[in-house]
Regions:
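A structural feature that tracks compact, well-ordered secondary-structure segments
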Residues: 104, 108-143
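Regulatory modules associated with amino-acid/nitrogen control
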Residues: 2-3, 13-14, 18-20, 24-119, ...
Length: 161
């Protein structure tokens, strides 16, 4: 599998090599007008999310789709649909929407999340990123979600339903 390489080009990161992406498109042909990010599919998700700090995970239904936990020596965090926030939540920030990079990402791929973050940062859209074994999820505040998807489309990402 060939590793992706990125170069900085006119304020967004563009791919200069693109091979071996499972379940994704191919690198555009030389001289093609097709965007360089073709093949990176962005899939918006329906739920409205909460980002929470919890005392423990006892009240969390981890069998629900889209439940993400993170535990460190300093805190226990939870990202879940708004309706699934447990009672033992210490703090919460509601009003997040999410999209994921469709397909499975190989661990050798680099710069994918950085490219998305750069496009959104250039438009002053804050993100909360979560990585799983298969792929990356990106959350933005609900008020910024449509603008984020539009910015990514403009940068050549393919938004699918």
């Amino acid at each position: 599998m060939k590793r992706k390489q990125y170069t900085k080009d006119s304020s967004i990161l563009k791919k200069t090599a693109w091979e071996g992406r499972r379940g994704m498109g191919k690198e555009p042909e030389a001289g093609s007008n097709e965007p360089k990010n073709a093949g990176l599919y962005i899939e918006p998700l329906d739920p409205l999310f909460s980002v929470c700090k919890v005392t423990d995970y006892k009240g969390v239904d981890i069998e629900l789709p889209y439940v993400f936990t993170g535990s460190t020596d300093q805190e226990k965090s939870l990202v879940c649909p708004v309706g699934a926030v447990p009672e033992n939540t210490v703090r919460r920030d509601d009003g997040w929407k999410a999209f994921r990079i469709k397909g499975e990402l190989d661990f050798s791929l680099t710069g994918i999340l950085a490219g998305i973050a750069k496009v959104l940062a250039d438009r002053r859209i804050g993100i909360f990123a979560i990585s799983t074994y298969n792929t990356d999820y990106v959350l933005t505040k609900e008020k910024d979600f449509c603008a984020a998807l539009k910015a990514l489309e403009t940068a050549g990402y393919l938004v699918v339903n």
